[in-house]
């Protein structure tokens, strides 16, 4: 069923060819949005776009020129981006190797995709959003940013830090956008079983895959704009309760990930 506040709006979902990103693309299409699905794998995004009646845009989010072309293509075919979902990400390995045996170039590439890619995508859509005084950005984080290490955890020493930086980036960006009509959120989807996380095994505490897409749908609709800049967990946070407590959350500085003394 479509949502009146979202019907006809344009969403761009990076990393939308599979896993969590594909689920978000499907959810936003069901809400009535016109969805652009972006990723490096043409076959994957073509499949999802065909399924939801959207468009597929092949792009490497770590490449500034590619991101500019991606946004231009979406604007030409669908119109200005109303909602950007930054889900594109890579793990870059496992914890099998100690840090001193990791390839520095591969380690840094995780940051180029997970953090720089998010930065470049935000940078590409924000001028138009700020000019219109309307827009929403949802950055998809990970429990790898703050959970204790565990056997089989993906990404070696790169993935978790890249996602931790993403939370802080979202908080700072939201502060810069305050009063400009654009809301930025960072979510944790929980431990969703995907190709990236499958090595954790059947006994891992898996999160239902539909929770993150449902949360993104609520955030995209605007009712949670008072929570801009906050960290929201798809499984452990009740978004309706958070919306009702938005003033308290702001006043008491809740739902923020920070190092504490």
Describe each region flagged by the PLM.
Residues 122-123, 171:
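A short, exposed helix-loop element centered on a Lys and neighboring polar residues
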